């Protein structure tokens, strides 16, 4: 079966909540994700190959987008699905005319940093004490489309 990316549906919400709370230690609720789905600026996409492999959460506003979270389920990691999901997402954003893509990432998340750098993101600044535990965040940027 081939890899596909689709928008989330209500049946995916419990998995999103579980992952956000498990991987990011966020206090995310089902109601919060349902509210996100009704917000026209927030988009979730799921990567599927027979089963859900991971997802990405984005804010999209005019010609700018921000990645809020990118998750590959633990049992699906180290299979290049993070790259595939990011590539699918960048292609989708290019199709709809997004020019600027940003994200924040923990300096300690070396796997994510490696992925983002491989996909052409550049670190543009540091947000001091950004996370609840006092860890900084690297702000990363990628220009999309052609100039």
Language model features: what each stretch is:
Residues 3-75, 86-88, 92, 96, ...:
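Acetyl-CoA-dependent GNAT
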Residues 72, 78-91, 110, 114-118:
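Conserved acetyl-CoA-binding loop-helix of GNAT-fold acetyltransferases
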Residues 79, 96-99:
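Short coil/turn segments at alpha/beta junctions that flank glycine-rich nucleotide-binding fingerprints
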Residues 99, 106-110, 129-147:
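C-terminal "cap" of GNAT-fold acetyltransferases
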Residues 116-117, 121, 140:
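Conserved active-site tyrosine of GNAT-family acetyltransferases
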Residues 125-126:
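Beta-hairpin "wing" of winged helix-turn-helix
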């Amino acid at each position: 079966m081939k890899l596909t990316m689709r928008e989330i549906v209500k049946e995916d919400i419990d998995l999103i909540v579980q992952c956000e709370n498990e991987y990011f230690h966020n206090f995310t609720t089902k109601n919060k994700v349902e509210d996100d789905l009704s917000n026209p600026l927030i988009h979730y996409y799921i990567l599927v190959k027979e089963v859900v492999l991971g997802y990405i959460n984005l804010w999209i506003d005019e010609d700018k987008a921000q990645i809020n979270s990118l998750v590959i389920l633990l049992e699906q990691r180290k299979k290049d699905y993070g790259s595939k999901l990011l590539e699918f997402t960048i292609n989708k954003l290019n199709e709809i005319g997004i020019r600027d893509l940003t994200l924040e990432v923990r300096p300690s998340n070396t796997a994510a940093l490696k992925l983002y750098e491989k996909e052409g993101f550049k670190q543009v600044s540091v947000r001091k004490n950004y996370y609840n535990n006092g860890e900084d965040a690297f702000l990363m940027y990628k220009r999309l489309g052609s100039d």
